[in-house]
Swiss-Prot record:
Assigned protein family: Belongs to the MCD family. Bombolitin subfamily.
Name of the protein described by the UniProt record: Bombolitin-8
One GO BP: defense response to fungus
Compartmental location: Secreted
Sorted UniProt keywords: Antibiotic, Antimicrobial, Fungicide, G-protein coupled receptor impairing toxin, Immunity, Innate immunity, Mast cell degranulation, Secreted, Toxin
GO cellular component, one term: extracellular region
Transmembrane domains' residue ranges: none
Functional summary from the UniProt entry: Mast cell degranulating peptide. May also display antibacterial and antifungal activities. Its mast cell degranulation activity may be related to the activation of G-protein coupled receptors in mast cells as well as interaction with other proteins located in cell endosomal membranes in the mast cells.
One term of GO molecular function: toxin activity
Tissues and organs where the protein is expressed, per its UniProt entry: Expressed by the venom gland.
Amino acid sequence: LKLKSILGKLGVILSHLNK
């Protein structure tokens, strides 16, 4: 697993939660 990929997915999830 790539850290960047994981962080990217987490970032997207957080973005949706913030909305």
